[in-house]
Each structure stands twice: as C-alpha cells, then as structure tokens.
UniProtKB/Swiss-Prot annotation:
InterPro entries assigned to the protein according to its UniProt record, in alphabetical order: PLipase_A2_dom_sf
Residues that hold Ca(2+) according to the record: Y28
Textual note on the cofactor: Binds 1 Ca(2+) ion.
Catalysed reaction equations from the record: a 1,2-diacyl-sn-glycero-3-phosphocholine + H2O = a 1-acyl-sn-glycero-3-phosphocholine + a fatty acid + H(+)
Protein's name in the database: Phospholipase A2 acanmyotoxin-1
Organism whose genome encodes this protein: Acanthophis rugosus
UniProt lineage: Eukaryota, Metazoa, Chordata, Craniata, Vertebrata
Length: 29
C-alpha cells in the first residue's frame, strides 16, 4: 500500500520512539 509506505518512511525519518508492529500498523509516532 503506497499510503503505508509513505507513513513508514516518514516515521523512519523521525525515529523518535521504537517502531512496534512496523509491518501491520506503520508506527506509533
């Protein structure tokens, strides 16, 4: 899903807190 990929990239760039269930939810930023 393109929307999920965009969210994951944005969250990966922030790296504020650990990412849980990265594949399922994207992240908890």
């Amino acid at each position: 899903n393109l929307l999920q990929i965009g969210i994951m990239k944005r969250c990966a760039n922030k790296r504020r807190r650990p990412v849980f269930h990265y594949r399922d939810y994207g992240c908890y930023c």
